[in-house]
A protein has these predicted regions:
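ASCE RecA-like P-loop NTPase motor cores
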Residues: 1-123
Length: 123
């Protein structure tokens, strides 16, 4: 895949070695890049080291866009969306939303099991 070659080039450059080392040791890492480059960096990291990855985007629309972009790099089957609830899910008046609940459970189960997938949620 193209992302494998791009990921190898990125690793060879050493530009993100410090950030990757922090992430590998369980620490937080901050990388200042343009918002358009963020899905690529997540995809490159995932391609180099597939593991359970959680990304939090600012809003549902941004999360959908991020998930589609990462999916274009690593394959849609390796990206899951953790959709936000529409309204109050505990309200007695709330209509049943089995698809939404199913997608949420699939994403949460994937994270809990440590399956190699990129889960994209919104804040």
């Amino acid at each position: 895949m193209l992302i494998d070659m791009l990921s190898a080039s990125l690793a060879k450059s050493g530009a993100l070695d410090d950030a990757w080392a922090k992430l590998d040791s369980g620490q937080d890492a901050t990388v200042g890049v343009a918002s358009s480059a963020r899905p690529f960096l997540v995809a490159a990291r995932f391609a180099a080291d597939p593991r359970a990855t959680l990304v939090v985007a600012a809003g549902e629309e941004a999360a959908d866009t991020f998930a589609r972009t990462v999916g274009a790099f690593v394959g849609e089957e390796r990206v899951l969306r953790l959709p936000d609830y529409e309204g109050n899910p505990f309200s007695l008046d709330a209509p049943p939303q089995p698809r939404l609940h199913g997608r949420r459970l699939e994403a949460l189960w994937s994270l809990q099991q440590g399956k190699p997938a990129v889960v994209v949620a919104s804040a």
